[in-house]
Amino acid sequence: MFDSNLVNAWNSHDGKRVAALYADQGVRHQIALEETVFTGRAEVATAAQQIQDAWPDSVLEVRGVIEKGSRVVVEWTFRGTHQQDFGLLPGRGETTELNGVSVFDLDGELIREERVYWDGATLLAGAGVLG
């Protein structure tokens, strides 16, 4: 159930819907090029919307889930066309495919903390920054 809610929220392209999965003071750590931390639903919503705006046709696919108590590990693939700038990465119309893993600590049905791990070099290469 958790993974289908996650997929539906991300694939809705609505940052507020993604943020609604988090506890009021839930924390999202994006760990790739450098760690970025978003605390609270408002920050999570903004961060999610920036991703969804940069890749407006993006699709999140869950490839595997492991659950143990209040911890859930989700292996995923994110695909989309990089249309708008994302931070220092220019949107050039290139297709992006990122594989990653998210580790969630839940408080009941809500995300208390998420640590997102993905390959930053793949994103940089797709944006034309690397080879």
Located regions from the model:
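C-terminal and inter-domain tail/linker signature
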Residues: M1-G131
